[in-house]
Amino acid sequence: AAQAAHRVGALLVVDATSAAPYELLDIERLGADVLLVSANRWGGPQVAAMAFRDPSLFGRLRAVNPDRTLTGPERFELGEHQYAMLAGLIASIDHLAGLDESSVGTRRDRLEHSMFGLRHYQQRLLFYLLNSLASAPQVAIIGRAERRVPTVSFTMPGVPAAKAAKRLADNGVCALSNVPSRYFAGLGVPEYGGAVTVGLAPYSTPYDVDQLVRALASLG
């Protein structure tokens, strides 16, 4: 994709928001010119960012800020920074880098080590989650199991997604319902009452999966 875009002079912009909590991102390996992330997806503050591989791009793109005296990234920012949130952003990354207490070295080194272990743990737990949902009555998983991040959306024909999410919340399970999605709309998901979306966090356990399935079973 990167080579095809660059051959015609286009930029490759990768929205890595959904992958960031689960995969170690490398803008060079991806071949992306711009990488988009949002810290709230890994438990950080409500801060989104565009990471540019080449700082010279700042001068090539049309500015958003009307102040034409600005240079660099300030050309694409409006208003003051939320410094408390930026401090929380750093803290959230340090938290991920410290999940494995044996990790040493720079922040990037520790993050690589911790994310490697986290990925293996969550892939095993994801396998358990998918199998548990597949065996639950009235649950239809959306999408394929291969190459999936630990986020799962499903429908329950005859049960509105909002009702299912409310039952999960009442049982201590956090879930989203009816997330706006053209993909879901194209699949006709709204016709089945909408989709429920759940995701695994570093602290998720098999017990959480069991609690999820028990709560869904109570809707049958």
Residue ranges and their predicted role:
Residues 1-220:
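Pyridoxal 5′-phosphate
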